């Protein structure tokens, strides 16, 4: 999964969001077209998000790049 951020259709760094990032993540996913990919950068692994993604038809792959940095590649199926 180690690609540059430029390789994705959209990137959202949730670490820069004050408060709960769920709404911003859902907004970013709404903008994705079929086959497009969002790179979500977070300070923790967002395990509760995975069920929501699957329910909405998205696939995901997670890579921990530092102790407090996770890259979640989310693709619209």
Residue ranges and their predicted role:
Residues 1-77:
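Acidic, polar-rich N-terminal leader regions of halophilic archaeal proteins
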């Amino acid at each position: 999964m180690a690609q540059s951020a430029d390789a994705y259709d959209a990137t959202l760094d949730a670490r820069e969001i004050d408060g709960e990032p769920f709404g911003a993540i859902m907004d970013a996913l709404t903008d994705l077209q079929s086959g497009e990919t969002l790179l979500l950068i977070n300070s923790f692994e967002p395990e509760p998000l995975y069920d929501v993604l699957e329910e909405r038809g998205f696939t995901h792959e997670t890579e921990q790049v530092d102790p407090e940095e996770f890259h979640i590649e989310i693709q619209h199926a």
